[in-house]
């Protein structure tokens, strides 16, 4: 086993085809987004962490989202082959895709993805992997930062997979120009 935490962050370049990225973004014009909130397991409440700077998100269905969702299986398979851990071969599934929208001055506070609130209904489990996808790169700012200070270089169509636990804190810096679109799903 490799002891370097960075080893378990896998970037799959151009995993999402440009045409699909463009189609998803175009179709998002018709979708209502809501202010993103984190679930606080101590207070059992949802709350923002960045006040007026909090990004917006949606689980809404848009044309192309199902195609992308089905292809995530292959990305997860690639990741499991990459980390090559014979004792970690099974997973039950992954959540429906959540789409994040960052307009100017919006960000996501530092956090880890050990999320339990997404498994309150039909799905049962604990997230083991986070899958992030980047639908565009024609904006300024909005850098994904891991471990407080490590900027992840990502481009349109890239997919990033990493463990969903306290060892992988991450945030998104404020967007300074344009609109940043990304997707997220959690493997359980």
Model-derived regions: residue spans:
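Fe(II)/2-oxoglutarate oxygenase catalytic core
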Residues: 1-159, 167-188
């Amino acid at each position: 086993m490799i002891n370097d935490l960075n080893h378990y962050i896998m970037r799959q370049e151009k995993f999402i085809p440009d045409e699909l990225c463009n189609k998803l973004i175009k179709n998002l014009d018709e979708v209502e987004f809501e202010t993103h909130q984190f679930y606080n397991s101590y207070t059992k409440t949802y709350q923002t962490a960045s006040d007026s700077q909090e990004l917006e998100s949606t689980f809404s269905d848009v044309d192309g989202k199902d195609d992308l969702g089905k292809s995530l299986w292959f990305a997860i398979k690639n990741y499991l082959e990459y980390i090559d851990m014979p004792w970690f071969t099974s997973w039950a599934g992954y959540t429906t895709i959540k789409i994040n929208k960052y307009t100017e001055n919006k960000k996501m506070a530092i956090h880890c993805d050990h999320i339990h609130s997404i498994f309150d209904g039909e799905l049962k489990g604990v997230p083991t992997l986070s899958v992030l996808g980047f639908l565009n790169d024609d904006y300024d700012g909005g850098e994904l930062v891991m471990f407080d200070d490590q900027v992840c270089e990502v481009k349109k169509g890239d997919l990033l997979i990493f463990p969903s636990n306290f060892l992988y804190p991450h945030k998104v810096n404020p967007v300074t120009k344009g609109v940043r679109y990304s997707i997220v799903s959690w493997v359980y």
